[in-house]
Amino acid sequence: RKFATKRYQTSIKPTLNYTSDFHKEIKSIVSELNLPKSFSCFHIRRGDKVGEKLYTWTQKTGRTESKRFEFCDYLKHCEDIKTIFIMTDDFRCIQEALEYISDNNLPHKILHLTNESQDGHSETLNIQNARSYSREELVQFFAEIEIAKLSDVFVGTRTSNVYKYIMNTCTTNTKFVSLD
């Protein structure tokens, strides 16, 4: 298991503090999910980092930044935990997970905050279009981060900034598993 050291948690904590209103919104979202005592969290990357969306790095080098991992790659690290929260910005990940569970007749339950209009991230397109994120999108993102910190097992890719941030700010006994 990898945990953030108390010293590092102390040094990073002042870096980002939620306002009381923002924190209330996050708590409300987490509460509405009715998370069970035991659940796993999968951070599934899609979009530009795995070559599915426009990305300058891929155009220049011909390589993606990260390997694309499938739902089953995540699941094999915590098959005994029957409730899974999926963090993603691409609704297709949710659909793929539900199809896998159905096709394999598994008893797992999927929870998520991703909506059907979310189709993955493209940093290049976001810069070209001067995209900014709404408060609602930011609340959703940080709610996902707080949910991840509550999980028994967090499965993701250590090359992701999201993985690094969660691991370095987590103060619970969450087990971290990296696929890369």
Where in this protein do the model-derived segments appear?
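Secretory-pathway luminal glycosyltransferase catalytic domains
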Residues: 1-81
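Catalytic donor nucleotide-activated moiety binding site of glycosyltransferases and closely related
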Residues: 43-45, 49, 81-133
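A short acidic (Asp/Glu
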Residues: 52-55, 94-100, 165-168
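Short secondary-structure boundary/capping segments
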Residues: 56-60, 100-103, 171-173
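Short, flexible loop segments at the rims of nucleotide/cofactor-binding pockets, characterized by
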Residues: 61-64, 131-135
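Short active-site oxyanion
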Residues: 80-84, 151-154
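A donor-sugar binding/catalytic signature common to diverse glycosyltransferases
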Residues: 141-180
